[in-house]
Curated annotation (Swiss-Prot):
The gene is rlmH. One of its GO terms (cellular component) is cytoplasm. InterPro entries: Alpha/beta_knot_MTases, RlmH-like, tRNA_m1G_MTases_N. It catalyses: pseudouridine(1915) in 23S rRNA + S-adenosyl-L-methionine = N(3)-methylpseudouridine(1915) in 23S rRNA + S-adenosyl-L-homocysteine + H(+). Belongs to the RNA methyltransferase RlmH family. It comes from Geobacillus sp. (strain WCH70). Specifically methylates the pseudouridine at position 1915 (m3Psi1915) in 23S rRNA. The lineage of its organism: Bacteria, Bacillati, Bacillota, Bacilli, Bacillales. S-adenosyl-L-methionine binds at L76, G108, F127, S128, K129, M130, T131, F132. It is found in: Cytoplasm. PANTHER family: METHYLTRANSFERASE (PTHR33603), RIBOSOMAL RNA LARGE SUBUNIT METHYLTRANSFERASE H (PTHR33603:SF1). This is Ribosomal RNA large subunit methyltransferase H. It is an enzyme of class 2 (transferase). Its main location: cytoplasm. Keywords: Cytoplasm, Methyltransferase, rRNA processing, S-adenosyl-L-methionine, Transferase. Transmembrane segments: none annotated.
Amino acid sequence: MHIHIISVGKLKEKYLMQGIDEYKKRLSSYAKVDIIEVPDEKAPEHLSEQEMEQIKQREGERILAKIPNDAYVIALAIEGKMKSSEQFAASLDKLATYGKSKIAFIIGGSLGLSKQVMQRADEALSFSKMTFPHQLMRLILLEQIYRAFRINRGEPYHK
């Protein structure tokens, strides 16, 4: 399986980089993992609804340009479906069974994802009704992907 994590913004925090590197290393025996960063739009504090949509649109165009044509796309969004770790593992296993060898996870910027990105997504996944920093979400996502592979292989880890 080839996993693409497409995320808005550049990761700067060293402690997050270390965690991400650790999970990429752990995942290397299960899947190829690529993390693709697309530039975020600098935004002033007080934006109109129209300005927010324009920013999401520009970031969305960059995201869409990085999605492999044949990838199954999972957008991370608050309004997405919540799953337990076991349900998430089962859904990844099902995708593999149906020959979906490329999966692209999309993490938006601070304003979320554009309508176009959400339309391109095959599904929307929510980790919580809470909002997380998009940089931290990369680490959380990688940990859950790793956990899913361990669950699917019956290997100890997730309890």
